[in-house]
Amino acid sequence: MNTYNCIADDVKLGTDVRLSKFINLYGCEIGDETKIGAFVEIQKNASVGKCCKISSHTFVCEGVVIEDNVFIGHGVMFINDSYPRATTGDGNLQTEADWKVERTVIKKGASIGSGATILSKIKIGANAIVGAGSVVTKDVPPNAIVAGNPARVLRYIEHTVEGHNEHF
């Protein structure tokens, strides 16, 4: 660790986790042999599995579950509230107690391209690939390749060879 990181006491780090500079981690769990890039924030009640790569400038909000062997590209944004508002119905500024955190799950072996936005209550299936810049508004099936705004299925991965997906 270095002096440029903010890592709260309640963070659970696995073995051989590699942390870049300028990261914020609090109340989260990071699995073994995972690499966290620069300028990443991972909030409380989020978890990242083992052997993952979370690239720079990514925001992983509360309630996101990232399983093992997942790749997250640069600048990926996770959203955890379907109806965000600044104030309550009576005009008062919302507090943490006013927000409803909605869970998002990224299944084992999935890859999310740089600049993608993943909306709340989404499940990205095992080995799925989300194209760069996509906006994911609904669940992605396992082995699907999706892209666009909103993200749509382009095709499916045919088979796996030695633990790696064959895309074409």
Regions found by a protein language model. Name each.
Residues 132, 167-168:
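A C-terminal cap/extension of S-adenosyl-L-methionine-dependent methyltransferases
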